[in-house]
From Swiss-Prot:
Residues 1-31, 80-146 are annotated as: Disordered. The keyword Cell cycle applies. This is Arginine vasopressin-induced protein 1. Residues 106-123 have a biased composition (Polar residues).
Amino acid sequence: MGTPASVVSEPPLWQVSTAQPRDRGRGRKQASANIFQDAELVQIQGLFQRSGDQLAEERAQIIWECAGDHRVAEALRRLRRKRPPRQNHCSRLRVPELGSTAADPQASTTDTASSEQFGNSRRTSARVHRNWNKPGPTGYLHQIRH
């Protein structure tokens, strides 16, 4: 009968890998370590301004001057945008019970006060935990500049 054509023929060009041996098996190019390498200063400033950064111009200038430095790329990976706390987070939502508001107004006042106190203590401890032994975003940039 013979051998099927799919076994005998060469693979299509799109399946042939021209990558180096260590990259075989991957179907795409390696990513750049520094995403700002070919960006213009104005583009970088706009990016920082849209994220709400107060020092957008200074930060953009530092990034633009050090675009090829691998330490800048590492600092950019560590940089995270600070988000304001969400007001209606699911752990802070509270549905009032129907019987408690009319039956005992003193008890509902006590419950509300204790839940507010608990919410404040959770926020404070979360803030302390988040900032514990961790420099701010400016620390990363100053660390690589000096």
